[in-house]
Every structure is written in C-alpha cells, then in structure tokens.
C-alpha cells in the first residue's frame, strides 16, 4: 500500500511559545481575528498560562475559536488532548504554551490522530531578553529550537538587536526573526549598521 507522505494533516497545530509577558496573547488575539486566518471550521485555543492580557471568550467565538485552559503541566496529557479532540472536533488547534514548561515535553507527546504541528512561533520581550537568556537559557533554547518565526517586541533599544538575532540563528538557523517597536516592524536593514 502506498502512503502519501506529503498529505497535509487534518488538524494543523500552531505552537506558540515565549516567557510570561512576552506578547503571546496579544499576538494571538490579533492573529485569530484577522481575515487571513479565518477558516470554515472550529479553532481550539489551548491556554497553558494566564498572563496580563486575556481573551474575551465571546469575542473569540465570533471567529470560531473555543478556549480550553490547562492549569498544571501534569494535566496536559495525550489523554486530555484526545478528550479535547472528541469534545470540540477542531479544524485547527492553537496552543499558547507556558514559558516555564519544557517545550520538548510537549513535542514528544503523541498528538491525536490527524493532528500535526504546522508552525512553531516564539515571542520575546526584547526589554527582558538578556535577563531571561542569562538565567533561563536552556528554556529559551528549547522554545526557539525548530521555530519558524521568532518575534521580538518592545524593541526600544536597537543596539542589542543584531546580537539577539545571532542568539536565535545559532539555535534555529531557519527561523525568520522579526523585531517590532511601538510603531511596528523595525527595518532589518537598519540593524546591519548598528
């Protein structure tokens, strides 16, 4: 029997990582409401931590998003994911992962049949990045490893950004690295001259 190895998964999983207050919720609140991200079916949003920003469940329902919360790392199990799959029958899953949990533990899990990680995105608060890198480097490395997009926000000081890019590229050469300040995306060409 021939198996189509290029078959797209039935349920695409988007894994969002980043430390607390790195902008995960803000990014997802924006993205989930955009026309380009809309699908016909249901999106299951799994929250693994509560940050400063919150989701409005009624607002999210307008975009076909249902929210489930996992309080403790021990509760995020293969069985729980199966239960959520049966309960919601999602077309897409977005996981806002807890920044203090090892991402590798989730990546080792057997996902429900038809689910596959489509994209891993990491958000970083540039104003606290150096502190996290110094004190929690192994967790940061896990977050960034295999990420397709690393988004640095709150980039008010442009001087260290080229070094931040190098820190990411060492771990995840394929990652697209984007820097944003309060006005939006920082011109990457300007970083070359810093």
Predicted features and spans:
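C-terminal helix of von Willebrand factor
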Residues: 77-81, 163, 186-190
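Phosphate/Mg2+-binding loops and adjacent switch elements
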Residues: 92-179, 184
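Nucleotide-state-sensitive switch-loop elements of NTP-binding domains
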Residues: 3-17, 22, 26-119, 123-130
């Amino acid at each position: 029997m021939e198996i189509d190895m290029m078959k797209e998964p039935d349920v695409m999983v988007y894994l969002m990582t980043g430390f607390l207050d790195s902008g995960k919720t803000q990014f997802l609140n924006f993205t989930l409401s955009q026309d380009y991200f809309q699908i016909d079916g249901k999106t299951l949003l799994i929250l693994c931590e509560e940050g400063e920003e919150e989701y409005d469940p009624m607002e999210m329902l307008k975009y076909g998003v249902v929210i489930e919360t996992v309080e403790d790392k021990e509760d995020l199990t293969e069985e729980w994911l199966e239960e959520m799959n049966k309960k919601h029958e999602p077309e897409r899953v977005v996981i806002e992962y807890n920044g203090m949990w090892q991402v590798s533990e989730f990546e080792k899990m057997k996902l429900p049949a038809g689910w596959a990680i489509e994209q891993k995105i990491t958000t970083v608060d540039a104003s606290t990045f150096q502190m996290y890198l110094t004190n929690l480097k192994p967790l940061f490395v896990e977050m960034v490893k295999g990420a397709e997009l690393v988004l640095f926000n709150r980039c008010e000081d442009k001087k260290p950004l080229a070094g931040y890019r190098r820190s990411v590229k060492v771990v995840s050469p394929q990652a697209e690295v984007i820097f944003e300040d309060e006005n939006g995306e920082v011109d990457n060409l300007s970083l070359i001259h810093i």
